[in-house]
UniProtKB/Swiss-Prot annotation:
PTM annotation, UniProt: Monoubiquitinated at Cys-8 by PEX2 during PEX20 passage through the PEX2-PEX10-PEX12 retrotranslocation channel: monoubiquitination acts as a signal for PEX20 extraction and is required for proper export from peroxisomes and recycling. When PEX5 recycling is compromised, polyubiquitinated at Lys-19 by PEX10 during its passage through the retrotranslocation channel, leading to its degradation.
Domain notes: The WxxxF/Y motifs mediate interaction with PEX14, promoting association with the PEX13-PEX14 docking complex.
Signal peptide positions (record): none
Protein name stated in the entry: Peroxisome biogenesis protein 20
The protein's assembly and partners: Interacts (via WxxxF/Y and LVxEF motifs) with PEX14; promoting translocation through the PEX13-PEX14 docking complex. Interacts with PEX7.
Gene: PEX20
Length: 323
């Protein structure tokens, strides 16, 4: 009753096992056998190549070496050129590269730690050097202070010994020491006074020489100035004389032209007029000016002869007939 298939009661574990073992697996077995036969035929076709292909072997070796050098990851250029990898593989490759960035970050962090450790070591060395320098300076100062203190103590002890010796010495020795000290002081004072006197005498002579040199320079400057003034005055006088000589020469040339013109009277002039021209005092004056016997004075207001006298004193009075 419990083992029949049509029973409505609950099935036992043994019934379930019997049902599962007793199922028809013919279709599944056929599919497995067909897949096994197909794989065996493909394997036989692949293994049928008995000879070694050198080209394929070289390419395989090159691919293997390249893969080892590149950590088994193809380059981006190879991914772009060869489309058989597909977008899925490229995305997986990029994801894997991003996942591998932690290696670079870890390396950079290690380098930063190394650099910081080096800087800390350098700072520690600098601090040690500074501490050593400060320590050496402090030691030198301490030694110098101890040396000064020792010298002061020695000087103090010498003074105490000298005082004790004076106190314990007889009066004669004390007087002798005081007298000797006084004589030495007088000698030093005399020597200093002599040096001061010599120095004062030297300074006096030096000041006198400087003052004398200053006065001499002033006198020489005045002499040079007076000489230069005389030279300038002589130049001015010479220049004035040259100008006067030029003017006198020009005036004499003009007077000569007038004298010649009055002597060569035109034929249209009457003899009476010609006689008056030749006998006139003006023609005689022009003749004397042309011969440089009469000149114009420096102020240009009168005629003078060679002696410097005014020629009007020698001319006849034109109004004598009317007086």
């Amino acid at each position: 009753m419990f083992t029949s298939n049509g029973s409505c009661g609950p099935a036992t574990a043994l019934d379930n096992l019997s049902k599962r073992v007793g199922q028809d697996r013919t279709l599944e077995n056929d599919h497995v056998a067909r897949f096994r036969d197909q794989n065996s035929s493909q394997n036989r076709a692949f293994r049928a190549e008995s000879s070694f292909n050198t080209t394929a072997g070289a390419e395989f070796g090159q691919f293997q070496n390249t893969s080892v050098q590149r950590n088994y990851f193809p380059s981006a250029e190879l991914i772009r050129k060869n489309t058989r990898f597909g977008d899925n593989w490229s995305s997986e490759f990029r994801q894997q590269q991003e996942n591998n960035k932690w290696v670079e970050d870890f390396g950079a962090m290690n380098l930063e730690n190394v650099r910081m450790e080096q800087e800390q070591s350098f700072q520690t060395m600098d601090q040690r050097t500074n501490m050593q320098a400060m320590s050496s300076t402090a030691n030198a100062w301490t030694q110098e202070f101890n040396h000064m203190q020792h010298n002061k103590e020695m000087e103090y002890e010498m003074r105490i010994r000298e005082t004790q010796r004076l106190v314990n010495a007889p009066a004669r020795e004390v007087f002798s020491m005081v007298n000797q000290h006084s004589q030495q002081h007088n000698q030093n004072f005399t020597h200093n006074q002599t040096q001061l006197g010599d120095q004062s005498h030297y300074m006096t002579n030096l000041a006198f020489e400087r003052q004398f040199e200053t006065v001499q320079n002033e006198i020489d400057g005045m002499d040079m100035f007076s000489d230069s003034e005389q030279v300038e005055q002589q130049k001015e006088l010479q220049k004035e004389d040259d100008n006067n000589d030029i003017e006198t020469t020009k005036f004499a040339e003009i007077a000569q032209q007038v004298f010649n013109q009055m002597n060569n009277v035109d034929t249209t002039v009457s003899q009476n007029t010609e006689h008056k021209f030749k006998q006139s005092n003006f023609l005689r004056l022009m003749d004397k000016v042309a011969q440089r016997e009469v000149e114009i004075n420096g102020s240009g207001d009168r005629f003078i002869d060679k002696t410097g006298n005014d020629i009007r004193d020698y001319l006849p009075d034109p109004l004598s007939d009317l007086r």
